[in-house]
């Protein structure tokens, strides 16, 4: 699903850096002790990748925040229009709660259409809302194209966000995990990505430090 998400940003003309800091991400390159720029791998003209498991904790400050890691990322990738940070909600809350890089972080929840995953998605949304004061969320839902549960799940999360957290689920998109990378991007995914880009000042891709925390809420990864 992350591949399709990155493709959608590329289609909007944005150069994306995917920072993979989840528990199952590859270990960071040994050169990371010298600086992050040397560890960023260019996958295509529109997409770069940083294996970042355990890297945020190397940048923890005296208050327990890993916000300095975001600053290091921005300095290491000055040409990136979008930074996608793929990590657990607990890690993202430490990273974004006290950061000053952007006033427009946009958390995107990634879930599938099973009850345990939906419960986990709500728990992550609650954690980010309370600890990092994030209030506008997006949802990327992995499910078959005609899943009878997909729309109901989005409605349920939207209702819970509004009624219990004072937050908003501003958009959602369904991605078929079995689809081929060459298949056309779903229109809903295009709309979701355009909404993320609109949260930053100015029009169109620009060097405005759009950092989108991506909380991977699939149970196997948490």
Language-model features and meaning:
Residues 11-82, 89-90, 98, 155, ...:
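P-loop/Walker-type NTP enzyme "switch/lid" segment
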Residues 4, 24, 53, 58, ...:
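Arginine residue identity/basic-tract feature
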Residues 68, 72-75, 81, 85-174:
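Conserved catalytic-core segment of NTP-binding enzymes
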């Amino acid at each position: 699903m992350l591949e399709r998400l990155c493709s959608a940003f590329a289609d909007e003309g944005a150069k994306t850096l995917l920072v993979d800091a989840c528990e199952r991400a590859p270990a960071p390159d040994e050169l990371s002790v010298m600086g992050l720029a040397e560890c960023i791998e260019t996958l295509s003209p529109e997409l770069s990748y940083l294996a970042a498991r355990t890297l945020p904790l190397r940048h923890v400050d005296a208050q327990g925040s890993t916000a300095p890691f975001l600053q290091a990322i921005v300095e290491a990738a000055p040409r990136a229009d979008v930074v996608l940070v793929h990590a657990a909600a607990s890690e993202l809350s430490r990273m974004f709660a006290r950061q000053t890089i952007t006033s427009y972080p946009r958390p995107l929840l990634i879930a599938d259409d099973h009850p345990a995953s939906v419960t986990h998605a709500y728990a992550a949304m609650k954690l980010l809302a309370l600890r990092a004061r994030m209030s506008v969320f997006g949802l990327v839902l992995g499910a078959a194209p005609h899943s009878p549960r997909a729309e109901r799940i989005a409605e349920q999360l939207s209702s819970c966000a509004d009624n219990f957290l004072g937050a908003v689920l501003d958009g959602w998109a369904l991605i078929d995990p079995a689809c081929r990378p060459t298949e056309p991007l779903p229109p809903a995914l295009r709309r979701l990505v355009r909404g993320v880009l609109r949260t930053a000042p100015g029009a169109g891709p620009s060097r405005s430090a759009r950092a989108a925390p991506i909380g991977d809420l699939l149970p196997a990864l948490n």
